[in-house]
Amino acid sequence: IVGGKDAPVGKYPYQVSLRLSGSHRCGASILDNNNVLTAAHCVDGLSNLNRLKVHVGTNYLSESGDVYDVEDAVVNKNYDDFLLRNDVALVHLTNPIKFNDLVQPIKLSTNDEDLESNPCTLTGWGSTRLGGNTPNALQEIELIVHPQKQCERDQWRVIDSHICTLTKRGEGACHGDSGGPLVANGAQIGIVSFGSPCALGEPDVYTRVSSFVSWINANLKK
């Protein structure tokens, strides 16, 4: 995240760090004891899921927090890695997540029609500037949901199943934020998908969660 600040410990108990061979790869969010939500491009093509771990309950990449093994990753079968559509995936955990003060699920938004031009919150461990380092501390930033019609004009790939944010140059998502949660009113409205790296005053684009709630529910590990 560019232009954010260190998040208070425990404020975002749904935040996940997906780490591949120990290095932060993507954000994700806790849906329930067995399932974590992320972007398809974070897990698509990973041959060895044994090297992918789900870290929860910590704000710091220098700490492991609570670590969970991955049983399976389900990528939306309509995911298009060129058009960046249907960029959504579920990570099934081998053992159930234990909830506590620092580890809690987030609910999914089913109705986001009134969100345009309203505030939302992005969290992640993405770079704090283009080409910059990964921050150790989880970052938070308040953004604004960009009007959909404007976003479709600004970013040619954008369709109805995307949702966008834009505030100003110097604020936004960056590499390593992918797969992480965009939240409004206590519900997740987006999954970080793509943008014009980083924070150049163009909209950031997210998978619109409400468009995929039925897919998510159908593909959860029960």
From Swiss-Prot:
Gene Ontology terms for molecular function: serine-type endopeptidase activity
Keywords: Disulfide bond, Hydrolase, Protease, Secreted, Serine protease
Catalyses which reaction(s): Preferential cleavage: Tyr-|-Xaa, Trp-|-Xaa, Phe-|-Xaa, Leu-|-Xaa
Disulfides per UniProt: 26-42, 151-164, 174-198
GO cellular component terms given for this protein: extracellular region
Gene Ontology biological process terms, A to Z: proteolysis
Active-site residue numbers: 41 (charge relay system), 87 (charge relay system), 178 (charge relay system)
Matches recorded under SMART domains: Tryp_SPc
Pfam families noted in UniProt: Trypsin
EC assignment: 3.4.21.1
InterPro entries in alphabetical order: Peptidase_S1_PA, Peptidase_S1_PA_chymotrypsin, Peptidase_S1A, Trypsin_dom, TRYPSIN_HIS, TRYPSIN_SER
Subcellular location: Secreted, Extracellular space
Domain Peptidase S1: 1-221
Primary localisation category: secreted
Family membership: Belongs to the peptidase S1 family.
Protein name: Chymotrypsin-1
Organism per entry: Solenopsis invicta (Red imported fire ant)
